[in-house]
């Protein structure tokens, strides 16, 4: 599947880089993750096998189908939504969570603003 310019998509495919990123974030079995724009799920694969709970927020419906077919549904959820319109309490009502993502450059500032707005949960 090709990246869609209108979503500012870029896909991480370098296996070594994905392994290095996973190592740097030090995933633990108690972690709860919110991944912004999981894309085809290459980074996702390194998270969901090791964390307690995972949610991926993907705005592209075509990629959502890819993700749902690639990963089992137990304790993992993929939501078709614009991250900027998401209230994190909808998915993590009581818990703090970690945010990760290969975010599109064209909305990186608004995403950082969203993170700042919801800092108590992150």
Feature locations, PLM:
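Catalytic cores of RNA-modifying enzymes
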Residues: 1-122
